[in-house]
């Protein structure tokens, strides 16, 4: 991976958010079945209810915000969780399997790389990969890298 551009080097954290039309079920899914640590919940904060997940020691957080109605789902919008090996991936997916959550068809890339895909309660896909992007990717696993300085 490349270094941060100078103008972004001072960023201290990154959060990405998505709306959920099945808020309570989605929070339970990510907390209880996926196992993401729930850092904080909020109610009526500037008109929104939400939950913030993260990983210990990481400056990256994932926020679920309750939607008033149906939220369109784009199946290319995936949350990808990278594990160091197949055993760690299997351990991470055991709760989903025990709860009866059925896998959905994975994108051909994930299937070829040993990943499995599960839907969250909104129908968004969560991919569990048996490798860490940029560290121990399987042979042929890296997407083409940009050689342009303006990528």
What kind of region is each of these model predictions?
Residues 1-9, 12-21, 51-56, 70-151:
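Vicinal oxygen chelate
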Residues 8, 17-61:
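Core segments of cupin and vicinal oxygen chelate
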Residues 58-62, 73, 122-126:
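Short, charged/polar, Gly/Pro-enriched secondary-structure boundary elements
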